[in-house]
Amino acid sequence: MKSARRRSRELATQGLYQWLLSGSPGGEIDAQLRGAQGFDKADHEHLDAILHGVIRDSEALSAAIAPCLDRPIEQLSPVERAVLLVAAFELKNHVDIPYRVVINEAVELAKTFGGADGYKYVNGVLDKLSAQLRVDETQAARKR
């Protein structure tokens, strides 16, 4: 059974995918997500925080992700880009969620929505990004 937070991440990823492709306003995407299957079982507060936070901070999040990539962020598939934006937002703004949980959730999103091996790429990028955004937490985990 999926947790309410996982459902909120799934819906946020779907909404951000739509936003990346269409450029629709966040409020319009939000309204569409409220009618989506699984919305009733999602953590609405977390969904709103991710969706609107990523749209608001997309340039800064993309700038944080860019040095961890092997190609320009614009060349990523929209699914991988949406997943990475969700994870970057959580790494940056939700320090209550352990970085390993953020990475694992992103890998699961990439497996669900992305291409065959996209999850491996997402995992590698987020490993680098978490080392930059969560220095103390990642260093402590690596010493164990």
Swiss-Prot record:
One of its GO terms (biological process) is DNA-templated transcription termination. It comes from the Bacteria. One of its GO terms (cellular component) is cytosol. Pfam families: NusB. Coiled coil: none annotated. One of its GO terms (molecular function) is RNA binding. Gene3D superfamilies: NusB-like. Keywords: RNA-binding, Transcription, Transcription antitermination, Transcription regulation. NCBIfam families: nusB. Involved in transcription antitermination. Required for transcription of ribosomal RNA (rRNA) genes. Binds specifically to the boxA antiterminator sequence of the ribosomal RNA (rrn) operons. PANTHER family: ANTITERMINATION NUSB DOMAIN-CONTAINING PROTEIN, N UTILIZATION SUBSTANCE PROTEIN B-RELATED. Belongs to the NusB family. This is Transcription antitermination protein NusB. The gene is nusB.
